[in-house]
Amino acid sequence: MRFRRRRFGRRRRYYRKRRGGWRRRFRIRRRRPWRRWRVRRWRRSVFRRRGRRARPYRISAWNPKVLRNCRITGWWPVIQCMDGMEWIKYKPMDLRVEANRIFDKQGSKIETEQMGYLMQYGGGWSSGVISLEGLFNENRLWRNIWSKSNDGMDLVRYFGCRIRLYPTENQGYLFWYDTEFDEQQRRMLDEYTQPSVMLQAKNSRLIVCKQKMPIRRRVKSIFIPPPAQLTTQWKFQQELCQFPLFNWACICIDMDTPFDYNGAWRNAWWLMRRLQNGNMEYIERWGRIPMTGDTELPPADDFKAGGVNKNFKPTGIQRIYPIVAVCLVEGNKRVVKWATVHNGPIDRWRKKQTGTLKLSALRRLVLRVCSESETYYKWTASEFTGAFQQDWWPVSGTEYPLCTIKMEPEFENPTVEVWSWKATIPTAGTLKDYFGLSSGQQWKDTDFGRLQLPRSSHNVDFGHKARFGPFCVKKPPVEFRDSAPNPLNIWVKYTFYFQFGGMYQPPTGIQDPCTSNPTYPVRMVGAVTHPKYAGQGGIATQIGDQGITAASLRAISAAPPNTYTQSAFLKAPETEKEEERESETSFTSAESSSEGDGSSDDQAERRAARKRVIKLLLKRLADRPVDNKRRRFSE
């Protein structure tokens, strides 16, 4: 029976409760006098029951007993290099190999050179990862200050970072950051840092030098929000200690002549072939070409003059393969590191800079340890009697043998030895201890393959065509300069916004008022604790073999730092408002804070106003409820 609307009485319900449940009903279309035919046919419309109204559900949370708003302000050196090193990746110095070279030891007296050269660690592009532990290490090196201490606080929240990029005089550069990444992506960052690729990245910022923009010399400020994996919920400092907050990279860029260079070097990068993995050749080789090291060791007579370097075995002027093997012991394990020698250019620069003064030659080998990416291309066993023989030990030409530097034991003069490719392999010595070669016969393909010898820049890209891709800085290599090139230094300033929370023990440390407590000299890192150990203390859980530990004694007897005079970097006495408070709030969300740029006559009022704005912002972020948000409680 069809459902019809009655012309009289009460209107019937669209849905009728029947034995089989609710049944759908359809409207009855009546003909209208004003339209007889319709272009589109009518469809039956269904009366549907309205769903249940979503009701908001309030989720409440409580903040810790005590809150501390902390701003970490400091600076980073992001690029350190010389002209001609823009294609090299910056790397930290290997203190064991590069910065500490013992050339003489007489009893307990050790003569060494502990200073490194810019060539050993410099580079025109760099990358890194920022974490709370890294900020603590920077504080110990006097490179940042903490407005409030984290000592005694168990919990922490992160609200983002602000970075200020300063333009240089003559060199433009790119700065890039990423907050969502994994460890595998971070290791594959070399190809992504090529200037033509990074120029298209979403989070990259181009900083033009002052020479190109003489009028607009403003400092560019960017805000980096917290990672998507983090929310504004509280976390223990031990959990957030090594969590990567963001990943960054910085690289020099050439905007005047991005495509061409002079005729002395091959630069037809647009003619390079496309590889099987989809990358262009100049992108594939970016960051994977080692520096051009010396092919000759220093003269033995000059190097051993005065009775030093007694373990230097070569005689005369010895030619070598440009990549040497540094053999040492780390953690009771024999390790081989590949490095290049740069005594030639540094000796040349020193003698030219001094002018009238007559300097002696260097008494140590200037070594630069190759990074993992620079040893990407290696010789195979089948190439020993092929391409490798044609270049480095031809039958009727000059031979470039393998050089090993044995730094075992640590506080002794290293042993420098040379191994000919045409001679027999000894049954004992360095080759047996570190490479397992002791056949006592001529070199074979299998013996050469066990070395895993990296390819030098002569074999990978001696013409420098790959490193001269689009937008790369095009300058002759630093090794070919007659005098020392000019340095390039780029640095940034940062401000991190954290909030520490917890409930520390009551202050029990009382100082003698008759004893002087000087503000100077500055006690830099006395009030900041490593995030891994922050908040740990007490007698029951911190008793070692010799009694109460140092951390427990400090927590029991020391007053909690809560003023500027007790902060990491001691400032002048200031009047503070009470920030440690109790509060009950709902979940909050991190919002980016901004600081205005400009100039003012009264700097004190400007700093005070900025401080009040930041305190008010952090207070609103911590105490803002979420009653106005509607959520469906479905669990």
From Swiss-Prot:
<dbReference type="InterPro" id="IPR004219">
    <property type="entry name" value="TTvirus_Unk"/>
</dbReference>
<feature type="compositionally biased region" description="Low complexity">
    <location>
        <begin position="585"/>
        <end position="597"/>
    </location>
</feature>
<feature type="compositionally biased region" description="Basic and acidic residues">
    <location>
        <begin position="573"/>
        <end position="584"/>
    </location>
</feature>
<feature type="region of interest" description="Disordered">
    <location>
        <begin position="571"/>
        <end position="608"/>
    </location>
</feature>
<comment type="similarity">
    <text>Belongs to the anelloviridae capsid protein family.</text>
</comment>
<protein>
    <recommendedName>
        <fullName>Capsid protein</fullName>
    </recommendedName>
</protein>
<keyword id="KW-0946">Virion</keyword>
<keyword id="KW-1140">T=1 icosahedral capsid protein</keyword>
<keyword id="KW-0167">Capsid protein</keyword>
<comment type="function">
    <text>Self-assembles to form an icosahedral capsid with a T=1 symmetry, about 30 nm in diameter, and consisting of 60 capsid proteins. The capsid encapsulates the genomic DNA. Capsid protein is involved in attachment and entry into the host cell.</text>
</comment>
<dbReference type="GO" id="GO:0039615">
    <property type="term" value="C:T=1 icosahedral viral capsid"/>
</dbReference>
<dbReference type="Pfam" id="PF02956">
    <property type="entry name" value="TT_ORF1"/>
</dbReference>
